[in-house]
Amino acid sequence: MAAYRSRRGDSMRSLNVKCCGMEGREAGMVQIEAGCARLSDRPAFCGSASLASSEYYLFPGFVDVHVHLREPGFSYKETIMSGTRAAARGGCSAVCPMPNLAPVPDSLANLKVQTDIIRSDAVVDVYPYGAITKGERGAELADLAELAPHVVAFSDDGRGVQSREQMRQAMEQAKALDKLIVAHCEDESLLNGGCIHDGAYAAAHGLPGICSASEWKQIERDLELAAETGCGYHVCHVSCKESVTLLRDAKKSGVDVTWETAPHYLLLDDSQLMDDGRFRMNPPIRAKADREALLEAAADGTLDMIATDHAPHSAEEKSRGLRGSLNGIVGLEVAFSALYTGLVRSGVISLERLIELMALNPRRRFRIPLREGDFTVFDLDNPYTIDPASFLSKGRSTPFAGWQVYGKCLLTAVDGGVAWQDADFAG
């Protein structure tokens, strides 16, 4: 499918870089003029490695396969313009927005409402999902064949598909259409009104907990169905150690499965929670052992990609503490910085592995092309403090507020057009 995007760009200057590809280092230049950016004086851009100078690093543009842009239907939380500007500021040249919208993109007519706004307002490439079920209500499958040429994959993100037979039918159709099923795995019968992980913090503070089985039980079911149907299957926002074990074993057995986790599950556990809405999301931040399992998967190659699950809400909706706030935090503008600081600088994974997780693997799995004009430039040497008041997103709720991090995005180019330039970098 083709990406949807408007055409925007700002003037910039030239930047000398030293390119680090698979076959060594060579001099090069990023030329930015009249809203266009391109790499020159070097061979074709190699997306399998970072490009570096003594001052700046140039990477292939990131792809976030799990974002909530909220428009149409909930533009008081986020708009396609504000969300894609936030994406560009975080180094993304493409995003895949989830279908929990109003109207839900469960038909071509409803999808067109979304894509018309994307064509008008988006500053990065946008690859929308189509819904698995009509209205994401779980009662009847959407017309997947009608939607397939126009969407990147199918998902009912925001809730799990509760019926085993319905998920089987969805996988059979998606397999025939050569499309992925992208699953929010959550058994609603096991939620028990919980608001955070069913662990030490919940017990100490008298809060209802969400058990890990609510996630891994549905992953277990779906992996069986994926093996039976041969459907390509991708699991969203994995948070617990049991899920990691299931996914590792399924890969070894030949199931066509990939999975993502989010920065907050890699960098936080429930010992760090506060009674603040910026720590509430679904699935919840879990225990130290779960985080350790995710870190091991990131290091040993089991983890396929990192996606933010960027889910903005209004300030009022996030002001009610852990028990009363809505699920969801923002992450597009700070994901790379938090991960580079917490995982690369600490030696958990290499910089190349982080780029694989954020840029290369998402493109491969979701068939999103990497053009020479899709790149992002970062300063990795100078720290800055995460300040939600500076966000381009309408959302301000992040557990990383106040963190000192390394990795500031200076420029993002999308198909040669400048989608983001840092004020300190413009000249």
For each of these PLM feature ranges, what is it?
Residues 11, 141-306:
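Histidine/acidic residue-rich metal-binding segments in metalloenzymes
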Residues 56-121:
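Metal-associated gating/positioning segment near the N- to mid-region
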Residues 321, 372-427:
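C-terminal cap of metal-dependent C-N hydrolases
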Residues 44-58:
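Active-site metal-binding motif and surrounding structural segment of the metallo-beta-lactamase
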Residues 65-78, 101, 127-139, 158, ...:
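Active-site mouth loops of central-metabolism enzymes
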Residues 204-232, 299-300, 304-306, 311-378:
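His/Asp/Glu-enriched, well-ordered alpha-helical/loop segment
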Residues 1-47:
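N-terminal metal-binding scaffold of metallo-dependent hydrolase/deaminase domains
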Residues 17, 35, 55, 66, ...:
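Divalent metal-coordination and catalytic microenvironments
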